[in-house]
Amino acid sequence: AKDELVDDPRWNGYEVPPTSNANYGWILNIVSKLSQNGVAGFLLANGALSDDGTELKIRQQLIENHLVEAIIILPRNLFYTTDISVTLWILNKNKKARVVEQNRKLKRYRNREDEILFMDLRQMGSPYEKKYIELTEEDRAKVTSVYHNWQQEGYEETYENVPEFCYSASFDEVKEKGFRLS
């Protein structure tokens, strides 16, 4: 069974993910399914942002391959099944500058290959059913606005880093932190 993992085409170009933790196996499965302009979002425990060993090597490869677009830390108690804070990862197979028609409008994306947007939503949300937190419509609108403004040409006019909320990190900054995304 271990030989099957080594030869699995989903890991093509990456380290073989460890059998002891499926997180990076899932990430590479998702990457293998992305189209040329594909975007994926998925949730993982915050520990996946800074795992060492093989996970670190895979994370470094994902960053060097310009796939990680955004890391969004969500508030605790957002889900019924766990009370821990989790992270929304957004991977994008094409972070290059391009123009795309969406809903009969042209969107002008800037080159973001050497950047990752970090957002921390742990201070957002409102109480829900006594023990849960929900992101309000205003919270969701703010997050999506920041994310989309950051992606666009001319973002200098519409996006700014906000302490404790959002930060656009360069590749060099992430490399300096040892490819840890926390």
Report residues per predicted region.
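A conserved structural/catalytic subdomain of Rossmann-like adenosyl-cofactor enzymes
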Residues: 1-182
